[in-house]
């Protein structure tokens, strides 16, 4: 932990993370072929309401197919519907008890092996990079360099338009921007 506020509470932070993961998994379990990104966003909002979130650190992101390659700031192409063999991601940033639970995950519809490989590589790169950060105390630049190399080892190119940020008590922007 570094540079958290005086109100930071580890159990509250961990609970926020777990609730956020639950929301993402519940939304994914209700995703259906034919949905649009707007439908996915509505489903996320309905699910967040059920979990009594406080506010959002960032807008929901529910991206499908080719739109998954866009940065968060880029506008999605219209007219994209989830197909039988498709890839999509969910990224949400709710706060619970003033602690951020930002979490995202990539999913697939169907059994497309290429999509499965992408998802597995994403998770492997994430966990290997997190491990290296913990064990080696990487700086931000070193962390992204390491992640780039891990992506390349897995046959992919890291999309540097999609940078992450620290998590903790809200707002973390004081430390991020």
Question: Which residues make up each language-model segment?
Answer:
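Active-site neighborhoods and metal-handling regions in enzymes and metal-associated proteins
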Residues: 1-177
